[in-house]
């Protein structure tokens, strides 16, 4: 689906069921490669990133049965058939880098991963991944073509302190530590709910692994694995995205299966600007309650802070909130470029290289525009936009739904297919009027 036309002035009403978490599903598929045992995953989202990961696992030797209607994947990998990841998988997303940690136990003489692709939100260095793997005893070679890792003598448990609680590095080191001899302790680890889901999965598989409140994870190497049946947690990013779309359109949407305990920082921020929500037994209802009030500081952070993937759609809310609000992006150094699209629609957005917060972040001395000031409320005008990345894509669709002046043309919507199950159908069922290039106007 290369492009869509979105009619403005839409009020979203109804209900939507949130899917399984993208950022959990893809990592659990990689984790299934740790052994030759059978894994059954339930509540699997039908999105492009999962399809790409399934195809990657199949290329490596996995036998996969994916019942998309039942949302169930049955996977087991008797043998690893390739030690070099085909380049077509590395250019799509960053999942293949986790194979360095996941496959060193089964392929000790070498795993090669080509240079990575993914969202255009900054370099996202792999230094933390590679240095951690070295501490476990891996040999690492970095070239212009990609990353090579080997552990011919096996991995040995170690004490690792991450300079920054990187989600990807934490996942990679957990997977590698499962195949190491002895005990590994990872300090300053990321503890996002998707990582906790990975830990729960590994415990079911027979791994001895625990966490502490001080961001410490302890793992004992495992040789005997069990088959696992596991239901994936709901996607907190998808849930928040539809919640924000409901509020900004001045509508009311019940997001089934949204978990309050996974979304506390988001719900706090939403309430701080006047957005309405009601936590119910099987989900959260989001609604427009009163005119939105800005004057807030939105600062992204690792768990338990306000996660970076909520930031872009939230900026659309701030463009409709009265007052001057500040966004301080501390996770990715180049995640505010999408604001040029909102500015094209009429939003008042100013970018800054400085940390516009009492707290300086790791980008304070770099030449990265990682802070923004948004003045609102500003009527948005329909225009032509090209989606730069997944979450910016949903932000653009939100903005187009409330735009004045007719129809917005949005291109590169395939980005949305990476992370939102049937996003177009869900929006249309909520009342959005969206035409694809294959849709004929009557």
From Swiss-Prot:
Its main location: cytoplasm. It catalyses: phosphoenolpyruvate + UDP-N-acetyl-alpha-D-glucosamine = UDP-N-acetyl-3-O-(1-carboxyvinyl)-alpha-D-glucosamine + phosphate. GO terms for cellular component: cytoplasm. UDP-N-acetyl-alpha-D-glucosamine binds at residues 94, 309, 331. GO terms for biological process: cell division; cell wall organization; peptidoglycan biosynthetic process; regulation of cell shape; UDP-N-acetylgalactosamine biosynthetic process. The keyword Signal does not apply. Phosphoenolpyruvate binds at residues 22-23. Gene3D superfamilies: Enolpyruvate transferase domain (3.65.10.10). Its EC number is 2.5.1.7. It is found in: Cytoplasm. Keywords: Cell cycle, Cell division, Cell shape, Cell wall biogenesis/degradation, Cytoplasm, Peptidoglycan synthesis, Transferase. CDD domains: UdpNAET. InterPro entries: Enolpyruvate_Tfrase_dom (IPR001986), Enolpyruvate_Tfrase_sf (IPR036968), MurA_subfamily (IPR050068), RNA3'P_cycl/enolpyr_Trfase_a/b (IPR013792), UDP_GlcNAc_COvinyl_MurA (IPR005750). Pathway: Cell wall biogenesis; peptidoglycan biosynthesis. GO terms for molecular function: UDP-N-acetylglucosamine 1-carboxyvinyltransferase activity. Signal peptide: none annotated. Belongs to the EPSP synthase family. MurA subfamily. Cell wall formation. Adds enolpyruvyl to UDP-N-acetylglucosamine. NCBIfam families: murA, PRK09369.1. This is UDP-N-acetylglucosamine 1-carboxyvinyltransferase. It comes from Chlamydia muridarum (strain MoPn / Nigg).
